[in-house]
Amino acid sequence: MSGVLGIRDLGLQPYEPVLEAMRRFTEQRGPESQDEVWLVEHPPVFTQGQAGKAEHLLIPGEIPVVQTDRGGQVTYHGPGQLVAYLLLDVRRLSIGVRELVSRIEQTLIDLLASYGVQAVAKPDAPGVYVDGAKIASLGLRIRNGRSFHGLALNVDMDLAPFRRINPCGYAGLAMTQLRDLAGPIELDEVRTRLRGQLVRHLDYAEQTTLTGGID
């Protein structure tokens, strides 16, 4: 079992400053640095992963597009979507990347099950799905044995912008969200449940809430 997982609740934050802060944290951390999870919502933004292709951006319109260094293709972030950035020393956890992805997916599956929603992972398409519709996306980057980027769970948001792209590079991929499957949902409650599931599935002894900025 690992040590203490530090968790920061950042609220609503623009995407690019958080991206830069993740990169700095990953580059500057040492062998004893505490692993952290940053929980955040973003204003509307499309992000292109390293495998992203321009043809999957159909009609972005007024929503900005940001090129990132995570895995995967294009996705959408917006208010009402819970994003968790996983800043983990994967070597210290002694797990491979595939195992990390599987644990994150199971974290989401168990979280959704706590709301009575049956979700599954797909071996050929990272993320979590309910009856074929995607409810959570996953994209990581590993640098020097440390992960950054993470997961995005659709909780209670406007799904319309997903129709402006081919989500994750799949034309016509249906998207869904927790509100439509389980009724009215408090994002704070989902955030709390996600914290507990991450600690359990990533095998940390406990969690602690971190305060202060990420500059």
From Swiss-Prot:
<feature type="binding site">
    <location>
        <begin position="70"/>
        <end position="77"/>
    </location>
    <ligand>
        <name>substrate</name>
    </ligand>
</feature>
<dbReference type="GO" id="GO:0005737">
    <property type="term" value="C:cytoplasm"/>
</dbReference>
<comment type="function">
    <text>Catalyzes the transfer of endogenously produced octanoic acid from octanoyl-acyl-carrier-protein onto the lipoyl domains of lipoate-dependent enzymes. Lipoyl-ACP can also act as a substrate although octanoyl-ACP is likely to be the physiological substrate.</text>
</comment>
<dbReference type="GO" id="GO:0036211">
    <property type="term" value="P:protein modification process"/>
</dbReference>
<protein>
    <recommendedName>
        <fullName>Octanoyltransferase</fullName>
        <ecNumber>2.3.1.181</ecNumber>
    </recommendedName>
</protein>
<dbReference type="GO" id="GO:0033819">
    <property type="term" value="F:lipoyl(octanoyl) transferase activity"/>
</dbReference>
<dbReference type="InterPro" id="IPR020605">
    <property type="entry name" value="Octanoyltransferase_CS"/>
</dbReference>
<feature type="active site" description="Acyl-thioester intermediate">
    <location>
        <position position="168"/>
    </location>
</feature>
<feature type="domain" description="BPL/LPL catalytic">
    <location>
        <begin position="31"/>
        <end position="206"/>
    </location>
</feature>
<comment type="pathway">
    <text>Protein modification; protein lipoylation via endogenous pathway; protein N(6)-(lipoyl)lysine from octanoyl-[acyl-carrier-protein]: step 1/2.</text>
</comment>
<keyword id="KW-0808">Transferase</keyword>
<dbReference type="InterPro" id="IPR004143">
    <property type="entry name" value="BPL_LPL_catalytic"/>
</dbReference>
<feature type="binding site">
    <location>
        <begin position="137"/>
        <end position="139"/>
    </location>
    <ligand>
        <name>substrate</name>
    </ligand>
</feature>
<keyword id="KW-0012">Acyltransferase</keyword>
<keyword id="KW-0963">Cytoplasm</keyword>
<dbReference type="InterPro" id="IPR045864">
    <property type="entry name" value="aa-tRNA-synth_II/BPL/LPL"/>
</dbReference>
<feature type="site" description="Lowers pKa of active site Cys">
    <location>
        <position position="134"/>
    </location>
</feature>
<dbReference type="InterPro" id="IPR000544">
    <property type="entry name" value="Octanoyltransferase"/>
</dbReference>
<comment type="similarity">
    <text>Belongs to the LipB family.</text>
</comment>
<dbReference type="Pfam" id="PF21948">
    <property type="entry name" value="LplA-B_cat"/>
</dbReference>
<feature type="binding site">
    <location>
        <begin position="150"/>
        <end position="152"/>
    </location>
    <ligand>
        <name>substrate</name>
    </ligand>
</feature>
